[in-house]
Regions:
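Basic, flexible Lys/Arg- and Gly-enriched helix-loop patches that mediate nucleic-acid binding at interfaces
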Residues: 1-246
């Protein structure tokens, strides 16, 4: 007899609840149930037979996959679950007609481009460390940013005992009391740019993501969203298909 069971986190991602890694967090937090019983990491389900709920709501298959970009304002979190009741980016796309989740993360104090979708496999491939997706940030720091400090960050900074990957960093604008920098990274460690700047004595006062894998935020107003166009989708699916081929 054929076994139709798949891993629970894969089922959740295919149903548009979250990416696989975020789905694992929900399972570990005890927010997922299978047929009324709290699920554990490693559990498998038969999508046609088992009833799966997340926070009491029944999970159903995604009928149409949606992909859009959002200009995230400061003060919004991008976590799959927030016990503190803080404002969530999902609230900003509630009028999209379907439940969406963010691809990757952007700190609460940061702003700019976030991709939102209900396609868990797409999100998982795009955020996987092996994808090395380029992301561009416009970062304003207090005071002067010397070439020595920029070089140090370009070559890599030791964070939690692991050196950051080489990145591109240059001055976009100099003002009397602040410097505007551009960073291009292809990894996404927690609060990475802020911590890199802090390590060389720079204080970040504004951080905005402007581009992901060639998909640009452009003039999209803060707090607003729009569907990704055909060219943008082609750029992103090229990356996810390459990941599939590896």
């Amino acid at each position: 007899m054929k076994d139709n069971k798949i891993r629970l986190q894969k089922h959740l991602s295919e149903c548009g609840v979250a990416s696989r890694r975020k789905a694992e967090e929900l399972i570990e937090q005890g927010k997922v149930k299978i047929n009324g019983h709290v699920a554990v990491l490693g559990a498998k389900v038969d999508p046609k037979r088992d009833k799966v709920t997340v926070r009491g709501k029944t999970v159903t298959a995604v009928s149409e996959k949606v992909y859009l970009m959002l200009n995230k304002p400061r003060g919004f979190v991008t976590t799959a679950s927030d016990e503190l009741g803080r404002k969530n980016v999902c609230d900003l796309v509630a009028d999209a007609g379907v439940r969406l989740f963010p691809v990757g993360r952007l700190d609460r104090d940061s702003e700019g481009l976030i991709i939102m979708t209900n396609d868990g496999e797409f999100a998982n491939k795009l955020t996987h460390p092996s994808s090395h997706v380029n992301k561009t940030y416009r970062v304003t720091v207090k005071g002067e940013a010397s070439e020595e400090k920029l070089l140090e960050m370009k070559e890599g900074i030791l964070l939690d005992g692991i050196k950051t990957l080489p990145c591109d960093s240059f001055v976009a604008e100099r003002k009397p009391d602040r410097t505007v920098l551009i960073f291009v990274l292809n990894e996404g460690r927690n609060r990475q740019i802020r911590r890199m700047c802090e390590a060389v004595g720079l204080n970040v006062i504004r951080l905005k993501r402007t581009e992901i894998a060639g998909v640009k935020l452009g003039m999209l107003p803060q707090g607003k969203w729009r569907p990704l166009n055909e060219r943008e989708m082609r750029r992103l699916t090229n990356i996810t298909q390459k990941k599939e081929d590896v």
